[in-house]
Amino acid sequence: MVIIGILMSKERIKKTALEIVKYIHGNIKACNIPNQKKENKFFAPLVYLCQTECDKILSNTKISLLERLLKCAKIIGDLQSGNCMQQTFLAFQRLLMRLIEDKLSNFSTCIPISVMTISNHAFLIIDNDIVCDPWLNFVGDLKDYCFANMKRKEYFGIRSDWTCFTNSEVYDEDS
């Protein structure tokens, strides 16, 4: 019975993540999309503004990284622009809120979520094996992800007991 509940939860997580990814992929403008030179050039100033605002927020170490990510998500949503890292921040914020609303996370336990990076790309890993990549419009199992075999680095993560980490090993006590 527990296995069935776990499988149902994973399917609910994937469904929720897919809704979020579809929204972001369709509404948040990027400027680094392959084979879209004209659109990229048009949206570049707005994306640059969004990245600049997020960089200002992220450099403010007086507040926790979690707070900084949530503030960036607000800017990204307001400006409706951002490349893969900004889109991942927005997906993180929306997914975290939805997991709480859908009662998949509560005050004592949380579905683990990590903002991951590889060389020049960012995406989420949810519950250790579900990938949510708004820039690539992908939600699925880690084993099926195009970057599955690349070395990943955790930028920020929330564990099942709500502890927060930066860079996989550094406990972020402020978050």
Predicted region positions:
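A structural boundary/capping signal
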Residues: M1-S175
